[in-house]
Amino acid sequence: MSVRRSASLAVAAIGFVTLAACSSSSSSSGSPGSAASSPAKLKSIFFANPLPAYPDWATADKCFKSETAKLGIKGVTQGPTGLQINDQFVLDRISQAIAQNYGALMAVPITPSAYEPLFQRAKSKGMEIATLNTGTATKTQNLEVGTDYGTQGAKVAANIGRRPGQQNVGIITNQAGGIGDVIINAFKSHLPANVKVVATAFDGGDPSKTVDVAEQLLTAHPETNILFSWEGTAVAGISTAIKEKGKVGKVFGVVNDLTPQVVDGIRGGTIYGTSRQHFCDMAKKAVDLLVAVSQGKQVPPTTDTGTTFVTKANLDAVLAEAKDES
């Protein structure tokens, strides 16, 4: 194992150790909005952020606070630190929010079966619920806002197919089933003639394991020239594996989200492209739709905020657009 990889894994380990002990909490308003200051019946929203340390979810936090402040609504966000999902931490914070009588809840039910009972309890207390980026994985919410993963998977396949020559894809995902399969199955169902999936490997959703998983895939399937992962936290491992295997310029990552690591990878030649999800738009629309629900208005059960496929060709333009949006 290289010194560079050892350092990156140490950082990941530190993030995991501190995960259970710390949280991120912020409020866009010191107290619940009064009837005079709020345009709606809704006075407070709790946002259970799954990964506030991840750059795009940090953007969602920022835009959530901006939108709730604009509307005079108390907006509080909490979530674990580090870059590894901690469902139990988030579930505990949702339980607290229910006990504190928040008017509405925004959440990302990564493990739907664990979240559904809490959603039912929240609804029984009169809370409105918006889920983000998980489609119809749960049933009790009033509405869902975020990326349509089926559409995203098809778009990724089409963009890989625009590369010249045969594209042999190795997929890296957390596990079989779940939200990842929605993207992957759509990807597989829309493969252009020059794109073939040669292998699928699992890293357990642990970014400290991705580099080894990626290197093993490249060793077992040397014909691979694309490593595709929907996991935003897999980027560093994919880029490191490509470098350590001496495959820069021969193998390229196709990943998710537009984080600083992804930008560096695109500019450095380890990442071909990424799906930029619109996290700011997600957060703001979720707030606005919850307000509409509280006013008795009809809202769509799902709202697709779309993705933009980003390569070196449009990177600077998309970065400028992202800066303006947030």
Label each region the model flagged:
Residues 3-5, 22-326:
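A residue-level marker of the well-folded mature domains of exported/periplasmic proteins
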Residues 1-11:
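Bacterial N-terminal signal peptides that target proteins for export
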Residues 17-21:
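C-terminal motif of bacterial Sec signal peptides marking the signal peptidase cleavage site
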